[in-house]
Amino acid sequence: MVNVFLIIIAVVIPALVVLASLYLIAYFQHPDDKNVAYFPKIIVILGLTLAATSILMLPLDVANDGGSGGFPMDILWIIIYIAVAVFAVVICPFAMFFYESEEADPGAGSQIAGAFKGTFAILFAFTALTIVLYVFFGVAEIPTIVVLGRFQVLNYPFMSDISNITYALPEIAAIIGGNDERIRFDPGNPDLLGDGSEYVEYRLDKEFLQFRVSIALFIITMVAFFGWLLFIIFGGIGLVALPFDMIGDFKNRPQRIPYDKYLERKKKIGERATELVEIGKTIQSRTSGGIMSKRDRKNYNRFRQAIFLLEEDYERLKISYKRQGGKVIFYYAQFFGGFVALGVSLGWLLHIIIYMITAPEPFHPFLNSLVIALNNAWGFLGVIVYGLLSFYLLFCVVKGNFKFGLRLFFLFPIHPMRVGNTMMNAFLFNVGLILITSVSITHFCTMAFSQFTSTTAINSLFETAVKNLKILKWFWVVYIFGVFVMAVLTAIFLFIKPKDKPAKIRV
């Protein structure tokens, strides 16, 4: 029977996410994008709604209680994740290329033609890779043990200091009780008459049940795989960088300065700006044909990083003099938020150590106990805490991507989110990143809160099919370590080099 309350929640939550997305665009968008660029804005709203829905479906799956709530969650999960794949691979790239295309460029044809070219290249690469991997590795190998029977042992014929005894019948293996002692049992042996206090479970050797997964499920696996690669890098970086920068921004907040100091700093910024203008002209002249060499692309990324840091320095200078240091309460709120973020990051890292890495026999349930206790006290409390913890991971991914782009700017250009100064291509880039990593974050949370999600359809989807695919199953063994190791390396790196510095551009 369908649970009416769950239907209401399933409708209300996406509606709230849409409203939050509208506010996010209005708060962050650049003035040049006001009342224009409606198509990219619609894609941003739909993408954020889809990503948030995919994460918040996990509590809905828990409340559905193995299907008793009336929702076909196994089908809904596949629909949502296929939609995520379409948005991340096709729609967001198309909208981004469409926004960035220059109609004045005769080589681009039109905005739509330019967008189709870039999108087709991404779609072709993803489709080709998916087909090749599906043909060779689209088979799940489920470990199984064939149980022949469970019998009562009439006697325990060996002494406590002997761990292994072999009898006749070598084709039958047995496990006694809860111990891992393997013996051979001969039911015809008269020495086994006894009190019947022990049990023997007859088993064959471990076997693997093989079946080819559906192409839809394999596409979800591909998105999850790429999402995990991004989550390991950006999520691990963001877990440290987010609280680190929030606290560091308070320490380095703009201070009130006199007029002469303002003129001195403004002059230095002007000199940097003049130098960057000349560098920009040089880069533009070398790429007038629309094609960048590897070196030119690296220089372009360095150029964008230097421009961003220059703009940041100028904004801080204006706050220091024209606004007399700005609103102090904002920086104290950020300072407090930094310590809250630090606590959440430490909580996640501790949970990885004592619960996820030590599975299947974890040292302590930790966050599971918190969510379950709150869920038992009042269902929405558990959902709220889960939502806050999971969305925090999304913020860490966005922060990690930005931090990675600032420090390793030669790999790809940065797409910062700045209040009142964010172009739609930055929105689209970050929405695509959020969509891809939302799948891996849901998978991560399914394992992190496995006691909370044990009867869910998504747990069966990930644990049965996705985690047991050929070759890829070995990746799932190490990715939890990857997140933790990346966080530790980031902490070491940021303590050694805490400040972001402009790159040296070699033109």
From Swiss-Prot:
It holds the Pfam family LMBR1. InterPro entries: LMBR1-like_membr_prot. Disulfide bonds: none annotated. The chain crosses the membrane at residues 5-25, 42-62, 75-95, 120-140, 215-235, 335-355, 378-398, 427-447, 476-496. The keyword Membrane applies. It is a multi-pass membrane protein. It is found in: Membrane. One of its GO terms (cellular component) is membrane. Its main location: membrane. Keywords: Membrane, Transmembrane, Transmembrane helix. Belongs to the LIMR family. This is LIMR family protein DDB_G0283707. It comes from Dictyostelium discoideum. The lineage of its organism: Eukaryota, Amoebozoa, Evosea, Eumycetozoa, Dictyostelia.
